[in-house]
Swiss-Prot record:
Protein name, entry field: Biotin synthase
Cofactor note: Binds 1 [4Fe-4S] cluster. The cluster is coordinated with 3 cysteines and an exchangeable S-adenosyl-L-methionine. Binds 1 [2Fe-2S] cluster. The cluster is coordinated with 3 cysteines and 1 arginine.
Family: Belongs to the radical SAM superfamily. Biotin synthase family.
Cofactors required: [4Fe-4S] cluster; [2Fe-2S] cluster
Pathway(s) per entry: Cofactor biosynthesis; biotin biosynthesis; biotin from 7,8-diaminononanoate: step 2/2
Catalytically driven reaction(s): (4R,5S)-dethiobiotin + (sulfur carrier)-SH + 2 reduced [2Fe-2S]-[ferredoxin] + 2 S-adenosyl-L-methionine = (sulfur carrier)-H + biotin + 2 5'-deoxyadenosine + 2 L-methionine + 2 oxidized [2Fe-2S]-[ferredoxin]
Keywords recorded for this protein, A-Z: 2Fe-2S, 4Fe-4S, Biotin biosynthesis, Iron, Iron-sulfur, Metal-binding, S-adenosyl-L-methionine, Transferase
CDD domains xref list: Radical_SAM (cd01335)
């Protein structure tokens, strides 16, 4: 066999499915990252087409229902009370205001409505309003997601009874890099909340942030952690760091955009039936790079001009990109794997 022939078959040495049931070693994930770019993209697109319509993307809208004043010290976050970002803390929004925003999101084409609160964890006094928000958004025909921080068992059950479809609680990064980003919440705290959410019967939305100064191996460590959750998340948001002034990470050098695309592809291969979502930082990607992300297996994105406290590409621009690519927005029901 010639050298060229050998090189051509090397990507096939990297398994499409997990090397052992439900297990992806960090070394296996690193091997995926290190494939030639075209080979990685081809593999990811194969996996994507096996389970999803490759030209359909779910549009999600994210609303900050309680902004600022968070007692956690996440190094990337403008809403932490530990950082001087000029953001003023606000109270929890009224239910009617949230439902008005949800109606506007639906009118603009979104099929999923996500509600985020800057808390370490919700207080019991907040639960009636939160469950009313879930019920109200569900009545509009939108898929619902919340991210409220850590949950107790009873709180997870209350949200489940209200009909919450997804709960988001990100791992943020690998266990090895985690301590350089946050000190007020442990990695195990995050895993425990995911267990409570899953036990309550709510779908898990869990991903992370890349470009915080971590190494490629540490990015692979995040993907390995996500892929080895049992089961892996139903929804995987991948955030590209937005280095916000006043946060400890404000001076972080931007990630190579092709590394971001690689991360999307590796997430698709290791979690073949998950919805992989382009999240914060999409504004830093030009149209060509976003198209590569869709080719790599991203099939959902946050849609609208604002994500919590950071900007996002305008909705009209997103619609124009879809038209140029021959892609279309899909409703929530159509995003189930193998649908």
């Amino acid at each position: 066999m010639t050298q060229a022939q050998t090189a051509a078959v090397q990507p096939d040495a990297i398994p499409v499915a997990a090397p052992t049931p439900q297990r992806w070693r960090v070394a296996d994930v690193v091997a995926l990252f290190e494939l030639p770019f075209n080979d990685l993209m081809f593999r990811a697109q194969q996996v994507h087409r096996e389970h999803f319509d490759a030209n359909a993307v779910q549009l999600s809208t994210l609303l900050s229902i309680k902004t600022g004043g968070c007692e956690e010290d996440c190094g990337y976050c403008s809403q932490s009370s530990h950082h001087d970002t000029g953001l003023k803390a606000e109270k929890l929004m009224d239910v009617d205001a949230v439902l008005e925003a949800a109606r506007a999101a639906k009118a603009s084409g979104a099929s999923r409505f996500c509600m985020g609160a800057a808390w370490r964890n919700p207080k019991e006094r907040h639960m009636p309003a939160l469950t009313e928000m879930v019920r109200g958004v569900k009545e509009l025909g939108l898929e619902t997601c919340m991210t409220l921080g850590m949950l107790e068992d009873e709180q997870a059950q209350q949200l489940a009874h209200a009909g919450l479809d997804y709960y988001n609680h990100n791992l943020d990064t690998s266990p090895e890099f985690y301590g350089q980003v946050i000190s007020t919440r442990t990695y195990q705290d995050r895993l425990d909340t995911l267990d409570r959410v899953r036990d309550a019967g709510i779908n898990v939305c869990c991903g992370g942030i890349i470009g915080m100064g971590e190494s490629r191996r540490e990015r692979a460590g995040l993907i390995s952690q996500l892929a080895n959750l049992n089961p892996y998340p139903d929804s995987v948001p991948i955030n590209n760091l937005v280095a916000i002034e006043g946060t400890p990470l404000e001076g972080t050098a931007p990630l190579d955009p092709f590394e971001f695309v690689r991360t999307i592809a590796v997430a698709r291969i290791t979690m073949p039936k998950a919805v992989v979502r382009l999240s914060a930082g999409r504004e830093q990607l030009d149209d060509g790079l976003q198209a590569l992300c869709f080719l790599a297996g991203a099939n959902s994105m946050f849609y609208g001009d604002q994500l919590l406290t950071t900007s996002n590409p305008q909705s009209q621009k997103d619609r124009a990109l879809f038209e140029r690519l021959g892609m279309r927005a899909s409703d929530a029901d159509a995003m189930s794997a193998d649908a």
